[in-house]
Amino acid sequence: MNYLDFESKIKEIEDKITSLSHVFEDEKTEAEIKKLSKKRFELMESTYSKLTDWQVVQLSRHPDRPYFKDLLPLIFTDFQELHGDRTFGDDLAVIGGLAKLNNKPVMVIGQEKGRDTKSKIKHNFGMMHPEGYRKALRLMKLAEKFNMPVVTFIDTPGAYPGIKAEERGQSEAIARNLLEMSALKVPVVCIVIGEGCSGGALGIGVGDRLLMLQYSYFATISPEGCASILHKTAEKASEVTQMMNITSGRLKELKIVDEVIPEPLGGAHRDYETTATNIRKAVAAELKILSEMTVGQRNSRRYDKLMSFGRFKEA
């Protein structure tokens, strides 16, 4: 397992437990393991109850954190992938298709970063091209045609900023998705599972409900990008994070996010199964409520929610 810098003391204890586990078991060894396990639990509770915003960002990028492809088979069944935007190509930074959630059909769409070097290149580190947003929109319109809910998973450092992407209409593709998603006639639930950065996240992030995993973040720009603009150096990222209000808890307070999905102690990377179960329960609960509304009720509530963002009062 990979450890972050603030987890060094936890690593020491877990290394000791692992070492003792390989020793011939006797009462003394067993007692020592129990003692260390209790100490580890208490230390983890203490550590993760007072994380800084920057530490949350670090957890959201943890190299062992579950990505969309890891969670997909743990949450949904009968997944049938659909490819291409029918205009240019098939962007593998986003994966989508038909699936079942608790035996009910849904259209599921998610950004995929890739785990190793080969897959990271294949999936372009989760940075979508215009054809990716158009593919996602094609699947959403298909879901609307067959009256299926849409569930999207957000995990991206941002939309791909390359010249070719701009030439193919990156900004238009994202803007088109914002427009179309705000008016879809089926329930739309969006979940941030890792990084939710800038327009790259918004392109599949407009819906009836926005959920976030506990240790994910949602921002208009990455902390490093913000620090580079304000302080001319990315090294100030940990400082600017505190004033960006990008963590799940803070965004829930600001009513940007509707629900925070709890993660296992230590983060989602420590228990994929529990993380997937928590997501499945949260999404199923949201879809149940949304499915009981009429199209008019859903769209009216969605409109009111979107129009409430960015309002302020002068003191």
Swiss-Prot record:
MF terms (GO), sorted A to Z: acetyl-CoA carboxylase activity; ATP binding; carboxyl- or carbamoyltransferase activity
GO biological process: fatty acid biosynthetic process; malonyl-CoA biosynthetic process
Pathway where this protein functions: Lipid metabolism; malonyl-CoA biosynthesis; malonyl-CoA from acetyl-CoA: step 1/1
Name of the protein in its database record: Acetyl-coenzyme A carboxylase carboxyl transferase subunit alpha
EC number: 2.1.3.15
SUPFAM superfamilies: ClpP/crotonase
Upper taxonomic lineage: Bacteria, Pseudomonadati, Pseudomonadota, Gammaproteobacteria, Thiotrichales
Keyword entries, A-Z: ATP-binding, Cytoplasm, Fatty acid biosynthesis, Fatty acid metabolism, Lipid biosynthesis, Lipid metabolism, Nucleotide-binding, Transferase
Family annotation (Gene3D superfamilies): 2-enoyl-CoA Hydratase, Chain A, domain 1 (3.90.226.10)
Organism (species): Francisella tularensis subsp. mediasiatica (strain FSC147)
Oligomeric form and interacting partners: Acetyl-CoA carboxylase is a heterohexamer composed of biotin carboxyl carrier protein (AccB), biotin carboxylase (AccC) and two subunits each of ACCase subunit alpha (AccA) and ACCase subunit beta (AccD).
Domain CoA carboxyltransferase C-terminal positions: 35-289
